[in-house]
Amino acid sequence: MKGTISHRESFLTHIRQQLGKDSSSSASIQRPAWKHQVQWETNGLLSKEELVEQLKMQCQRIHTRVVETTPEEAPSALRSLMTEYGEGSVMTSGDHRFEQYGFYPMFDSLQHEGFAVTSWNAEASREENIRLAEQAAYSVVFSDYTLAESGTIVLSSHQGQGRALHFLPMMYIVCIEKSTVVPRMIQAVSTLNRLVEEGEQAKGAIHFISGPSNSADIEMNLVVGVHGPVRAVYLLIDDE
């Protein structure tokens, strides 16, 4: 049942007048000019190499392994990780960068060896995508940005990448382009905000994921994998 709002404008005009504001509802709102910009200054002068070192140190604290590779060696590096951790089915996001870095021939060879390789399919039902994610041993995705300060990857849900892809498989492998590593959250969200202001269509939910699933009970006993992947590996691709 919908309600009806009566006298809204007169009510808001009265409040504006009492606050000494312009009574016109079309008066523009100006963003404040902050005297201090510590959110930008913190780690803002670090070089890319220094940010990568900070990222690797932070990943040790959040139980996440970082494997560095080149664009040419990225597919073989991923294959080596699967050999090390145990071969199994793979589900990827629908991302053009898998083709850009030459992952598809490696995925084809996995299928010839008898391992299922699927992608989050925008044409399939939600239930079917979730079923495949539940069965996958590996989730392989690309991050949009990575925060060096906290070891956090930033990515969005969209037609080729549902939320369940990041939480249901046991092993979570994130391909990170070195060029997308930023100091901290302010750089990532500011860029996302600017893109929307410039007219880019906003995607679905934005996810901030820091390593594998970590939980702790009241005694602070760490439990890994309760709400998501048991292991996380960041495959850092030097694209610069």
UniProtKB/Swiss-Prot annotation:
<dbReference type="InterPro" id="IPR022823">
    <property type="entry name" value="LutC"/>
</dbReference>
<comment type="function">
    <text>Is involved in L-lactate degradation and allows cells to grow with lactate as the sole carbon source.</text>
</comment>
<dbReference type="InterPro" id="IPR037171">
    <property type="entry name" value="NagB/RpiA_transferase-like"/>
</dbReference>
<protein>
    <recommendedName>
        <fullName>Lactate utilization protein C</fullName>
    </recommendedName>
</protein>
<dbReference type="InterPro" id="IPR003741">
    <property type="entry name" value="LUD_dom"/>
</dbReference>
<dbReference type="Pfam" id="PF02589">
    <property type="entry name" value="LUD_dom"/>
</dbReference>
<comment type="similarity">
    <text>Belongs to the LutC/YkgG family.</text>
</comment>
<dbReference type="GO" id="GO:0006089">
    <property type="term" value="P:lactate metabolic process"/>
</dbReference>
<dbReference type="InterPro" id="IPR024185">
    <property type="entry name" value="FTHF_cligase-like_sf"/>
</dbReference>
